[in-house]
Amino acid sequence: MLVITRKKGESLLIGDDIEITVVKLDDGSVKLAIDAPKNLTILRKELYNEVQEENKKATNFNPSILKNIKSK
């Protein structure tokens, strides 16, 4: 893991087309601006983890519950 120190207004580059800029520093939080291609999905890690967990739940389907459905 790379750890970088940045001040307000300073940026870092990832590859040729992603720039992350420190916009605001508050007590205990940092606001970042991310300039990246529109085709790139950017998610907060906690949201990503939530989506992954929901996907796991969705694949945990029990086909035996279909036996309770009556057909006409």
From Swiss-Prot:
<protein>
    <recommendedName>
        <fullName>Translational regulator CsrA</fullName>
    </recommendedName>
</protein>
<keyword id="KW-0810">Translation regulation</keyword>
<keyword id="KW-0694">RNA-binding</keyword>
<dbReference type="GO" id="GO:0005829">
    <property type="term" value="C:cytosol"/>
</dbReference>
<dbReference type="GO" id="GO:0045947">
    <property type="term" value="P:negative regulation of translational initiation"/>
</dbReference>
<comment type="function">
    <text>A translational regulator that binds mRNA to regulate translation initiation and/or mRNA stability. Usually binds in the 5'-UTR at or near the Shine-Dalgarno sequence preventing ribosome-binding, thus repressing translation. Its main target seems to be the major flagellin gene, while its function is anatagonized by FliW.</text>
</comment>
<dbReference type="GO" id="GO:1902208">
    <property type="term" value="P:regulation of bacterial-type flagellum assembly"/>
</dbReference>
<dbReference type="InterPro" id="IPR003751">
    <property type="entry name" value="CsrA"/>
</dbReference>
<dbReference type="GO" id="GO:0048027">
    <property type="term" value="F:mRNA 5'-UTR binding"/>
</dbReference>
<dbReference type="InterPro" id="IPR036107">
    <property type="entry name" value="CsrA_sf"/>
</dbReference>
<dbReference type="GO" id="GO:0044781">
    <property type="term" value="P:bacterial-type flagellum organization"/>
</dbReference>
<comment type="similarity">
    <text>Belongs to the CsrA/RsmA family.</text>
</comment>
<dbReference type="GO" id="GO:0006109">
    <property type="term" value="P:regulation of carbohydrate metabolic process"/>
</dbReference>
<dbReference type="GO" id="GO:0006402">
    <property type="term" value="P:mRNA catabolic process"/>
</dbReference>
<keyword id="KW-0678">Repressor</keyword>
<dbReference type="Pfam" id="PF02599">
    <property type="entry name" value="CsrA"/>
</dbReference>
<comment type="subunit">
    <text>Homodimer; the beta-strands of each monomer intercalate to form a hydrophobic core, while the alpha-helices form wings that extend away from the core.</text>
</comment>
<keyword id="KW-0963">Cytoplasm</keyword>
<keyword id="KW-1005">Bacterial flagellum biogenesis</keyword>
